Structures are given as C-alpha cells and as structure tokens.
Amino acid sequence: MPYTKKDLISMKDLSKDDIFDILRLALKFKELNKSPVKKADSLRGKTVINAFFENSTRTRTSFEIAAKRLGADAINFSSSVSSTKKGESLIDTIKNMEAMKTDIFVVRHASSGTAKFIADNASASVVNAGDGLNEHPTQCLLDLLTIYENKGRLENLNVAIIGDIFRSRVARSNVWAMKTLGINVKLFGPPMMTRDCEAFGVPLCSNIDEAVENSDVIIMLRIQLERQDGEPEFPSVREYSKFFGLTAKRMELAKKDVIIMHPGPINRGVEINSDVADDPKFTKILNQVENGVAVRMAVLDTLIKNRS
C-alpha cells in the first residue's frame, strides 16, 4: 500500500514498502534530471515554501531545485528577516503563510519536534528538513538511494556510522530506516558523542578499526560544535583525527568495494582526510548531493498526490 500520509516527519513513519516506493520514484526523476529539459509538471500551480530557521546550503537549495523542476512556485523564507524577529509566534507565522494558499512547507528548525508541531497545526503538507537533534528523513532517503545504486541492494549490508552520533539527526533517521530494511548498522564515536546510543539497539564499537572492519558502507559525521554546550568534548582536532578520523590506512580494514558517504559539510583533516574524501574509487559524497534533488522531487510529488 503506498505512503498516504499528509506529511513526512520521521523515517519511523515509513514502512519498507514506502521507502522502496519513494526510491523507485526518485530513480525515475534522476533520469529526468539527466535530460536537457529537466522539467515535470506534477506540482504546476502549487506553492512550496522552504521555511528554514537554521542555516543550510545543500538541503535548502536541493528542495528549491526539486520544487521548481516539478513546476511549483518555490519560495525561500528566511527567519532572519521575518516577523518572528518582531515577536510573532512560529504558528502565527506559519498560519499567515498558509493563508496565501501554500501547499507544502519544507521546515528546518533548531528545536526537535518543530516539524511535527507545525504539521499538527497546519492543513498544508510538511516535510521535515531537519529538526534539532531529532531526524532528517530526506537525507536518509538520499543516503539509501546512493547505497542502492552502488551496491545493487540494501539488505544484509554492513554500515558503519562514525562521529558525533548523539547530535546527528542524520544518524537517527538512518538507523531507524536501516533496521527496517535489514541493514546491519554499527556506531562509533567519542564517548560524549555516543551517549544514549543504546536506545538505537545496534552495536556500539570500542574503536574506529572495529567500526571500519568489514564494512560495505562508511558514513562519516562531522563534529557539531554549534550544538555543544560547556567544555570541549575532545582534547584537540589533532587528537580527534588520530582516534576518530577516517584515513587511507584505516580504509584497508573495510571491504575492497567499500563506499564512503558524508552528509556534509565536511571538515577535512578532522573526521575524514582529504585523500579519502577526494578518492573517486570510494567516495560517493557528490553522488549523495545529486541524489538529493531526485529524492526530494519524489517526496514532494508523493505528498502532493496524497493531497489530491
């Protein structure tokens, strides 16, 4: 049965069949994106507002391109110049934009749960483009598409997620979805950045070599310094790179056809060395970015059909 909900808030809301339906549709849109015209019309006459209350490069641009390629009017809302600076509440802001006949809100916010809060109070559809430490479902879907394209399957793969797991909404979405799909996930990072990981119900490795060993896919995560409070959680960048960074030498422990992924932005020489990040044999980071447009086209197309 196809995904029929009004919104996309969490990967927990998607069944295995839902995920594959979206990925199959994304593959069709990826073919469209290779054509000279790159245009469809399923969102013609519809309005998509990118309501981003946090900074973003890849996600916001990707959603804007996706909406426009489907024929929608895509509007970028910036909280820095909005009436929220004058004391207007979040819901009043959303209600005012909804009164302009908005069909879909794409929401990014620093507070976990904000996307669901908006979805519960709006008749327009809502896509969670990242809410605090909670989830980032479309990043997860583009990661899954990238893995599927490079491995030819999703089930029974070994995936290592390494870095600041505690603050990573990408890690949360990926773990929930990968468990649903039968992917073997293991986690690793500094102790303060892997606290509460037992809630995921997947193995937590004791060192990076254990995490990398026999992996089909390695997903590296940056240190989210902007979300840290108080004392630093590691002695220095040099120490972090030594014990938690991905190097060419460590790559030798993984499977020969391993692929490396990263949600971006990359901090070179910290969680990943440049020679690894730039190696076309292993690295699929730009492939992820490319797939982001197709996946977000698939999500927007699915939600607008659900509204019909």
From Swiss-Prot:
Binding site for L-aspartate: K86, R169, R222
A GO molecular function held by the record: amino acid binding
Positions annotated to bind carbamoyl phosphate: R58, T59, R108, H136, Q139, G264, P265
Swiss-Prot/TrEMBL GO biological process terms: 'de novo' pyrimidine nucleobase biosynthetic process; 'de novo' UMP biosynthetic process; amino acid metabolic process
Domain of life assignment: Bacteria
Principal EC category: transferase
Keywords tagged on the record: Pyrimidine biosynthesis, Transferase
Enzyme Commission (EC) number: 2.1.3.2
Listed InterPro entries: Asp/Orn_carbamoyltranf_P-bd (IPR006132), Asp/Orn_carbamoylTrfase (IPR006130), Asp/Orn_carbamoylTrfase_sf (IPR036901), Asp_carbamoyltransf (IPR002082), Asp_carbamoyltransf_Asp/Orn-bd (IPR006131)
Signal peptide location: none
Recorded metabolic or biological pathway in which this protein acts: Pyrimidine metabolism; UMP biosynthesis via de novo pathway; (S)-dihydroorotate from bicarbonate: step 2/3
Catalysed conversion reaction: carbamoyl phosphate + L-aspartate = N-carbamoyl-L-aspartate + phosphate + H(+)
GO cellular component: cytosol
Residues in coiled coil: none
Disulfide bonds: none
Annotated function: Catalyzes the condensation of carbamoyl phosphate and aspartate to form carbamoyl aspartate and inorganic phosphate, the committed step in the de novo pyrimidine nucleotide biosynthesis pathway.
NCBIfam families with a match to the protein in the record: asp_carb_tr (TIGR00670), PRK00856.1 (NF002032)
Family note: Belongs to the aspartate/ornithine carbamoyltransferase superfamily. ATCase family.
Subunit: Heterododecamer (2C3:3R2) of six catalytic PyrB chains organized as two trimers (C3), and six regulatory PyrI chains organized as three dimers (R2).
HAMAP family on file: Asp_carb_tr
Descriptive protein name: Aspartate carbamoyltransferase catalytic subunit
The organism's taxonomic lineage, starting at the top: Bacteria, Pseudomonadati, Campylobacterota, Epsilonproteobacteria, Campylobacterales
Gene: pyrB
